[in-house]
């Protein structure tokens, strides 16, 4: 093999390893059967969530996975594969792949990686069902807000009942004064 070709292949393997190391998670999908418009739609969905979606030769991914000790993926490297690297939200790649596969039967989720854990298809689907960070933060803030809102409502109700009680006392005193 010519040296420049070998260097190009080594560069691709290094690129894959770099993406794996930089990503918070990764999902491998079989995109066989997607037409151009569907593939474009999928790429756009990934891009909007800062998920890098790349197609590499299986042999290049094989070398990268072996060098990083990701032997669990080697069994999934057959057919046309693409890899989605989630750079920000660790759930984004899995969530987008799962949602897209639900509407497009030609996209097949094969495996994934989150943190230091290999995920089979079921594992990818499970993490895909976890709400996004923003949704979880909103729910958490809502749970903090609810007791405070109830306390404010209760304090307001007590203040109103005391105000009504003092008005009744004043009106009773006025009535007694008029009667005398």
From Swiss-Prot:
CDD domains: Ribosomal_L10
Subunit details: Part of the ribosomal stalk of the 50S ribosomal subunit. The N-terminus interacts with L11 and the large rRNA to form the base of the stalk. The C-terminus forms an elongated spine to which L12 dimers bind in a sequential fashion forming a multimeric L10(L12)X complex.
Function: Forms part of the ribosomal stalk, playing a central role in the interaction of the ribosome with GTP-bound translation factors.
Keyword RNA-binding found: yes
BP-aspect Gene Ontology terms: translation
Protein name per the record: Large ribosomal subunit protein uL10
Cleaved signal peptide residues: none
Ranges of biased composition (kind: Acidic residues): 166-180
Family named by the database record: Belongs to the universal ribosomal protein uL10 family.
GO cellular component: large ribosomal subunit
UniProt keyword list: Ribonucleoprotein, Ribosomal protein, RNA-binding, rRNA-binding
Lineage summary: Bacteria, Bacillati, Bacillota, Tissierellia, Tissierellales
UniProt GO molecular function: large ribosomal subunit rRNA binding; structural constituent of ribosome
InterPro entries membership: Ribosomal_uL10 (IPR001790), Ribosomal_uL10-like_sf (IPR043141), Ribosomal_uL10_bac (IPR022973), Ribosomal_uL10_bac_type (IPR047865), Ribosomal_uL10_CS_bac (IPR002363)
Region (Disordered): 161-180
């Amino acid at each position: 093999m010519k040296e420049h070709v070998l260097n190009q292949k080594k560069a691709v393997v290094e690129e894959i390893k770099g993406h794996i190391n930089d990503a918070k998670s990764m999902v491998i999908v079989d995109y066989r059967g997607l037409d151009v418009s569907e593939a474009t739609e999928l790429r756009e969905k990934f891009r909007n969530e800062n998920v890098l979606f790349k197609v590499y030769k299986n042999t290049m991914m094989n070398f990268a996975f072996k060098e990083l000790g990701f032997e669990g993926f080697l069994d999934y490297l057959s057919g046309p594969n693409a890899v989605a690297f989630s750079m920000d939200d660790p759930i984004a790649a899995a969530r987008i792949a799962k949602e897209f596969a639900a509407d497009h039967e030609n996209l097949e989720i094969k495996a994934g990686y989150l943190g230091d854990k290999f995920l089979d298809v079921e594992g990818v689907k499970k993490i895909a069902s976890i709400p996004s960070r923003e949704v979880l933060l909103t729910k958490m803030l809502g749970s903090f807000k609810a007791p405070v809102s109830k306390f404010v409502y209760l304090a307001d109700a007590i203040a109103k009942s005391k105000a009504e009680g003092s008005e009744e006392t004043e009106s009773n005193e006025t009535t007694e004064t008029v009667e005398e």
